[in-house]
Amino acid sequence: MPKVSVIMPCYNEEKCIARAIESLVDDYVMKHGEILVIDGLSSDRTVDIVTDFIKRDFPIKLLKNDKKLQCFGLNQGILAAKGEIIVRVDAHSSYAEGYVKKLVELLERTQAANVGGVMRPKGHTPVQQAIALAMQHPIGVGNAKFHLGNYKGFVDTVYLGAFRKEIFDTIGLFDTNCRTNEDAELNIRILKSGGKIYLDSSIYVDYHPRDSFKKLAIQYFHYGRGRAYTTVKHRQFTSYRQVAPPLLLMGLVGSLLLSLFNPLFLVFWGCYILALLAASLFTWSKRNISLKIRVLTGIAFMVMHTGWGAGFLVFFILPTRKHPKTRSGATLKKINHEK
């Protein structure tokens, strides 16, 4: 079996990282793998927790990411990795039994350049539960198959992913101008190089959402900004879900301003709110979900839409010192499928 390096960038994940590590480490990882935890100068107990695992002889190496951002941590982990295969993971999640082994087998079976499973958001508080529901609904996430599940086949992106290490010599490392959206940007380069991306929904990750709407808004603002950067860099839209939030936000702001002259323009707001309420109140009619959580889900939809849209638009409105480049770290070459 090929040696595997599991790359886990993190920052202040004391609440989640133990659960993430425990769910990843099994007989396969103990025999054939290593886990590289790249810490972005955490100020909580994250480092202490990881150090405790190392003392208990878990196959873990702890690296320090002085630049803090996730993209730098990912690249640092890839360069330090000893494995032939890189499995990219998130400290904010927990993983299905045999997760790493299943991805390695899927990578070899499909001969894809990147393989992954689906994200299953799991909330604990009412706000988290609402956000989790919003992240599993087309109104919240569009047609992204790794969110919606029940799909096996080739796609344009997956959640997290697994790669052969050699691919980074072909397409370059993660783009360090991407504070977020670095996964999607890398996947665009994979597709441009002739590689394929495969999703298997039987492989899943339990993702722990943000625990407040403020944190969700910040998260989606960065998502939108990152997607705008990727759109400019590659001069392409990969799906309608990229332009829907900024267009919606412009419509909401525009109709609000125009309503100062004619109240009829508020009809746009009314239709939007009714659509959110309908989605949150009636979509999961057969599930035992409280009215409170359903209403909170409607709020989560709005926060995700406006946060993402604002980030996308701000990228174009405010000047940036960093200009998108064609690649990151290597000359973009065609992937050799005959290896």
Which residue ranges define each predicted feature?
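Cell-envelope/extracellular polymer assembly enzymes that use nucleotide-activated donors
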Residues: 3-5, 34, 185
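Catalytic donor/gating beta->alpha subdomain of glycosyltransferases that bind UDP-sugars
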Residues: 107, 175-238
